[in-house]
Curated annotation (Swiss-Prot):
Family under the similarity heading: Belongs to the DapB family.
Pathway membership, UniProt: Amino-acid biosynthesis; L-lysine biosynthesis via DAP pathway; (S)-tetrahydrodipicolinate from L-aspartate: step 4/4
Protein name: 4-hydroxy-tetrahydrodipicolinate reductase
Lineage: Bacteria, Bacillati, Cyanobacteriota, Cyanophyceae, Oscillatoriophycideae
Binding site for (S)-2,3,4,5-tetrahydrodipicolinate: 165, 174-175
Documented EC number(s): 1.17.1.8
Subcellular location: Cytoplasm
Catalytic residues identified in the record: 164, 168
Keyword terms: Amino-acid biosynthesis, Cytoplasm, Diaminopimelate biosynthesis, Lysine biosynthesis, NAD, NADP, Oxidoreductase
Function, as annotated: Catalyzes the conversion of 4-hydroxy-tetrahydrodipicolinate (HTPA) to tetrahydrodipicolinate.
Cellular component terms per the entry's GO annotation: cytosol
First-tier enzyme category under EC: oxidoreductase
Amino acid sequence: MISQTSTPVIVCGAAGKMGREVIKTVANASDMTLLGAIECQPEYIGQDIGELIGSGPLEVPILNDLQGILVMAAQEKQPAVMVDFTHPDSVYENVRSAIAYGVRPVVGTTGLSQEQIQDLAEFAEKASIGTLIIPNFSIGMVLLQQAAIAASKHFDHVEIIELHHNQKADAPSGTAIKTAQMLSELGKTYNVPNVEETEKIEGARGCLAEEGIRIHSVRLPGLIAHQEVIFGGPGQIYTLRHDTTDRSCYMPGVLLAIRKVQSLTKLIYGLEKIL
């Protein structure tokens, strides 16, 4: 059994780049204990997750059995947390299963539809289980979004460019969608056209998000995660940019989310809501 003062943590997507970083962080946190490492890639199954991340044995085998780990978690005296960095195709069922077993989900996987998020919110509230869906765990990105909100009061034209590694499955990124949503909630319409635009190639102007905001997605090897919010006005351009140079920048936000979700009784969307 895990110490009554230590939070049991399950990591889904444990062998992925973000999953490995989360494993290292949880293993080094004095108030957390790694309960399970879930991965669907067959070449990793059965390995000790500590050996995989290069930190030495942690005595936690990599499994492809979330259900079994959730059953174990439900038996712990201290409420468990599941951190999910998997794939848009699997995250919804993972989160529903965790809530059903009383395990608090912290979700970094993007690609959930608004309908899925709403369904999970209703399910979590009915079960009184804290759930966090966070498109971006970087404190710097939260500051960028806050600066964008401030700038939007003075500019009527804005576009978002998000750039990620070419292994990212969804586009646009959850962070870009979240940024556009935050700007759209300010009660104004952006980018009112001065001319009738024609796209010679479909998608050349990016995707049209809420309130006229356009989002452009770039996928290239060599990138990690980057975002620009570009405002334009007569005689000036104002550019906000955040660059992730190492995934370790997300870990303070992940730790905060794991600790915070335990006191919640409903779903919350966005890191800025718990800072």
